[in-house]
């Protein structure tokens, strides 16, 4: 279940909306705008394996085909493309790995044994491709060469017990 905490349009609190059981309807919007929606949900109680959920102590998202609407209010359809910037913050002991789509642009060590990672995806995507994975994971890494000759780092993240399966 989603709980709307705040809604901002172009950096200003926005009050021209209706909140219904399964939708948020915005009114009187400019033709172009930046929208920021802050909401809360409970992934620990999400047993549908859709949206944001917990499995084996790790957080995962499964957004295809309609899971993103369990994470936040959104036009959750494949023709709506969005640039996602995601900041994940967690207790480092419990969630040492913080992953999302795109490029890792910032990592921070915070007080009280917490840390954060900010990911920026430079390519517009439909919401069903949004991804978050956090937890205690192991990585298999390999440098690969693309057809154009560029070297890229390939990483496959799994639970430690599954590393030999990769």
Q: Residue locations for each model-derived region?
A:
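Glycine/proline-rich low-complexity spacer/linker segments in large multi-domain proteins
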Residues: 20-22, 38-88, 135-144
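Hydrophobic helix-coil surface modules that form long, contiguous segments used
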Residues: 77-166
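A surface-exposed beta-strand-loop module
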Residues: 2-55, 112-113, 118
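Residues that cap or initiate secondary-structure elements
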Residues: 3, 13, 30-32, 41-45, ...
